[in-house]
From Swiss-Prot:
One GO CC annotation: bicellular tight junction
A Gene Ontology molecular function term of the record: actin filament binding
Gene: Pof1b
Function per UniProt: Plays a key role in the organization of epithelial monolayers by regulating the actin cytoskeleton. May be involved in ovary development.
Record organism: Mus musculus (Mouse)
Places the protein is found: Cell junction, Tight junction
Major subcellular site: other
Tissues/organs with expression: Expression absent in adult ovary.
Protein name: Protein POF1B
Domain of life: Eukaryota
Keywords from the UniProt entry: Actin-binding, Cell junction, Coiled coil, Tight junction
Amino acid sequence: MMSSSYWSETSSSSCGTQQPTEVLQCQPQHYHYYHQPSQAQQPPEKNVVYERVRTYSGPMNKVVQALDPLGSREVLSPLKPASSYQSLVWSDHSQELYSPTLKISTCAPSTLHITQNAEQELHSPTVKVTTYPQTTIRRYIVQNPEQEPLSPFLRGSQFFPGNNVIYEKTIRKVEKLNTDQECCPQIQCHHHVIQQPQIIHSPHCQQSHSSHQIQCITENDSNIGHELCHGGPSQIHEQVIIQDDGPEKLDPKYFGELLADLSRKNTDLYHCLLEHLERIGGSKQDFESTDTSEDIESLIPKGLSEFTKQQIRYILQMRGMSDKSLRLVLSTFSNIREELGHLQNDLTSLENDKIRLEKDLAFKENQMKEYEELLASVRANNRQQQQGLQDSSAKCQSLEENNLSLRHTLSDLEYRLKELEYCKRNLEQENKNLRIQVSETCTGPTLQAKMDEIGNHYMEMVKNLRLDKDREISKLRSQLNQYQKDVSKREGSCSDFQFKLHELTSLLEEKDSLIKRQSEELSKLRQEIYSSHNQPSCGGRTTITTKKYRTQYPILGLLYDDYEYIPPGSDTQTIVIEKTEDKWTCP
């Protein structure tokens, strides 16, 4: 079991990138690793020592690499198990320590200097780094219990508390020059248990356009060092002292570029807000002329460099732009709130009108149903009255025919009566003639008696004939009177029928006019229903059914680029609904 403290980690791909010099600070933490026994262990190769390369990365992705000692008690061979909670990741590719951010120089055992110079190379009096295919073991330790690691090899494992620290250990094969000497004091400044680690990049010599910077790693050692040789009884207690040459200076050029970029973005934000305010109908004069009186140059202290003045100028400009943007945002929200209030009022009015129109439509539909029922009943009554009128007209026609027949029979009877009267006169004249003739020829009582007998018989015959004719005439007269009475009665009934027909025709005309009006209203309603589902027709009369609403909503300018805002100086337009009158005929 061993304890170590690490800061953070970067992968081996980041070792070849040169990072800017910054101060690396971290908090010391102690974690324990347990060896996991391997299934098959093979003896290490001869004349080969396994050297571990540690890679650390700080808060700003600053990379520091260090070599573990040859006499470390940790894993000495890639064939032995690594003290980690993860499986070993093996890669068989050529790997050599050529990093521009880390080179190890020979130094005293108490101090380890790491120079950031790509021109230097690794020189050791006893160790020679050879370029041949190596076997690399990397182990990862993620120390953040609140966040699951991004690496697929670390998911599901136990994490240590910390601030997302990943430690990568690389083991390389290093060929020995002297096989008799396995260790040397010159390379004994290696792995220790760190109690209060602090990595400081201290610039020893800063020149203009110079890329050589020295990084010092200082550590406080609280554990006992490892043995120099396998059988050597002596032990070395090493301490790495912190070398702090003062705070590192920031790059003013980088800071100025950052301020310029922030100023540009702030200006772009202000112009974007101003454009949106113009699109919703706001005024921009109040915002552009408020801060013009402020003199930025008077606020800049004297005696500073031009670069510092420019940075302060950027900061003051950003402050002014931020103030303007704040006022623009507040004005925009006030305009939006006002427009939303107008929209809410118009929406409420439209909903009320919609409810009213729906009620009117329901009422008209009920009226339409009632009118249809009334129309059906009127049609039924009209059919019945027409049938009765046809029957009465047929009866009148039959009565007229009977009257004509009676008139013809009466004329025939009158003609026969005239014939009988004519025959009577002829007989009387003949009787006179016979009397005269008899009186001239026969004068005696027998003739007189015979003449009286013939006269009496003739008188009886005439009397009987007259009685028969009188009875027949009286009978015919009674029949004629009866016919006349019947005709008069029938004529009175016909006049009653005609009066009733006149009343019915007037009632029918009124019903027809009512039906016509109702059919017009029905056609209007049907046209409204049809126009509500389809586009309104072109013809017809136009009626205003809604109230006056606002037709301009500047808030819509935020949604549509082609929206044209009209100032509220003009009168509000009126929304109308076109209705088309179509005549609807009854089936």
